[in-house]
């Protein structure tokens, strides 16, 4: 099954991303949430990452393709249990944790274009506070517009 490209608009930045087939239940759930609008805030325990806290939300997801040390551009969903449910958006070095200790979360989405702006987004949220974020399925026009805007910046 081919998954759609996801456009992420976060603050003034845009990214194209690819869903990870090795987390099929997480991907399926995420697609039902789109378009998903929320606020990104800076993590408290994990390092260079942003998160969307979801409190006691229970998606009834298993751990799949989970990691505690995601790479920049990887987006994870922690399904809850030990700590609160959350999305984690990594822009640099991350060791995923909470006040309860180390955690692992489902890696289901990866930024594939625009990654050079990840650090700028992270630092913007760190110094200025919460920013709007929108995850949506990108149609061909949105992808073309994204790429033309990137090319114009060069």
Residue ranges and their predicted role:
Residues 1-22:
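N-terminal intrinsically disordered, low-complexity, charge/repeat-rich segments that act as generic
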Residues 21-154:
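Glycine-rich active-site loops that engage anionic ligands at enzyme catalytic sites
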């Amino acid at each position: 099954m081919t998954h759609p490209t996801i456009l992420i608009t976060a603050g003034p930045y845009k990214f194209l991303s690819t869903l990870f087939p090795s987390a099929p239940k997480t991907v399926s759930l995420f697609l039902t949430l789109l378009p998903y609008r929320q606020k990104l805030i800076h993590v408290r325990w994990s390092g260079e990452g942003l998160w969307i806290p979801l409190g006691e939300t229970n998606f009834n997801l298993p751990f799949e393709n989970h990691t505690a040390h995601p790479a920049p551009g990887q987006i994870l969903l922690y399904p809850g249990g030990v700590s609160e449910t959350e999305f984690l958006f990594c822009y640099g070095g991350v060791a995923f944790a909470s006040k309860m200790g180390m955690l692992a979360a489902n890696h289901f989405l990866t930024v594939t274009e625009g990654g050079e702006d990840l650090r700028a987004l992270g630092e913007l949220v760190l110094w200025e506070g919460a920013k709007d974020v929108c995850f949506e399925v990108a149609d061909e026009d949105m992808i073309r517009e994204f790429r033309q805007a990137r090319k114009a910046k060069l």
